[in-house]
Amino acid sequence: MTLDIFDQFTSPTMFGLPLAWLAMLAPSLMLVSQTPKFIKSRYHTLLTPILTSIAKQLFLPMNQQGHKWALICMASMMFILMINLLGLLPYTYTPTTQLSMNMGLAVPLWLATVLIGLQKKPTEALAHLLPEGTPAALIPMLIIIETISLFIRPIALGVRLTANLTAGHLLMQLVSMTTFVMIPVISISIITSLLLLLLTILELAVAVIQAYVFILLLTLYLQENVYVPPSSCMPHG
């Protein structure tokens, strides 16, 4: 039974060839693309205002230079969101339940913010490793702690996404198996079916929220390491 539960997280193969790349390429078919037509599709008309409002909410705290990250961040959010939603379909594979893929997304994006921060503003970037007003005796210890916390950030991004999706898929698997086994008992099967329906709605919300949280934390790291709004750079009186 344990193997059956976790079998949904194994990478699918056909004739010995991995098919995970198909699952990762599938969201590209659902992304909005610009067309030369004057009349936009309903999907484009619905999705564009939503993405625009999310981008404004995430990038308005930054200055004009930080807005160049909007495209890659929104594309990454849509990529994660589509994979999460497609993974809720029956008999499908969810690549975002694999820690290797999530770390492959989190580490390069986080590392880009850190490296650019060290390149553009090395003094401000290194200042985050030592809080202001720290006693001299605690300086070495705090530098080590802040450095460790800095390198834990991409791990937290990947593990958070993996853990939330894996827990939800396992719970849906257990409830669906219980519903199938309890079919002869009508009253219990109805209750478990309603529970499965509510759990599916919850997982839809989790799929959307986790994609948004992933990019939200990335923009916060970007704002901290690279771009600071002009209002916070006012000279002292």
Swiss-Prot record:
Q: How does it assemble?
A: Component of the ATP synthase complex composed at least of ATP5F1A/subunit alpha, ATP5F1B/subunit beta, ATP5MC1/subunit c (homooctomer), MT-ATP6/subunit a, MT-ATP8/subunit 8, ATP5ME/subunit e, ATP5MF/subunit f, ATP5MG/subunit g, ATP5MK/subunit k, ATP5MJ/subunit j, ATP5F1C/subunit gamma, ATP5F1D/subunit delta, ATP5F1E/subunit epsilon, ATP5PF/subunit F6, ATP5PB/subunit b, ATP5PD/subunit d, ATP5PO/subunit OSCP.
Q: What's a single GO CC term here?
A: proton-transporting ATP synthase complex
The UniProt function text for this chain reads:
Subunit a, of the mitochondrial membrane ATP synthase complex (F(1)F(0) ATP synthase or Complex V) that produces ATP from ADP in the presence of a proton gradient across the membrane which is generated by electron transport complexes of the respiratory chain. ATP synthase complex consist of a soluble F(1) head domain - the catalytic core - and a membrane F(1) domain - the membrane proton channel. These two domains are linked by a central stalk rotating inside the F(1) region and a stationary peripheral stalk.
Q: What PROSITE patterns does this protein's entry cite?
A: ATPASE_A
Annotated localization? Mitochondrion inner membrane
Q: What is the lineage of its organism?
A: Eukaryota, Metazoa, Chordata, Craniata, Vertebrata
Which family does the record claim for this protein?
Answer: Belongs to the ATPase A chain family.
Q: Which organism is it from?
A: Petromyzon marinus
Q: Which InterPro entries match?
A: ATP_synth_F0_asu (IPR000568), ATP_synth_F0_asu_AS (IPR023011), ATP_synth_F0_asu_bact/mt (IPR045083), F0_ATP_A_sf (IPR035908)
Instruction: Just give the chief location class.
Output: mitochondrion
Name of the gene: MT-ATP6
Reaction catalysis annotation:
H(+)(in) = H(+)(out)
Q: What is this protein called?
A: ATP synthase F(0) complex subunit a
Which residue windows are transmembrane per the record?
12-32, 69-89, 98-118, 137-157, 181-201, 202-222
Keyword annotations for this protein, in alphabetical order, are: ATP synthesis, CF(0), Hydrogen ion transport, Ion transport, Membrane, Mitochondrion, Mitochondrion inner membrane, Transmembrane, Transmembrane helix, Transport
Picking any one GO molecular function of the record gives: proton-transporting ATP synthase activity, rotational mechanism
Q: What is the membrane topology listed in the Swiss-Prot or TrEMBL record? A: Multi-pass membrane protein
GO biological process terms, alphabetically, are: proton motive force-driven ATP synthesis; proton transmembrane transport
Question: Does the record's keyword annotation contain Ion transport?
Answer: yes
Per its UniProt record, what Gene3D superfamilies does this chain match? ATP synthase, F0 complex, subunit A
